[in-house]
C-alpha cells in the first residue's frame, strides 16, 4: 500500500504518509498531519483505494 499512518511523537495525533515520498500525503496541497485516529484511518483507506483505481485504469 502506498499510504500509511504514523503516530506523531509525544502526541495523540496521526499523519498519513506517502510511502513513495516518505512525506505527509497532500490533499489539495495540504499536508495530512495532526489528524485524529479515525480521520487518519479513513483517509488512508480512501487514498489507497484511489491509488489502486488509478493504477488499474492506467494498465487498461
Where are these regions (language model features)?
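A short, exposed loop/beta-hairpin motif centered on an aromatic-Gly-Thr core
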Residues: 23-39
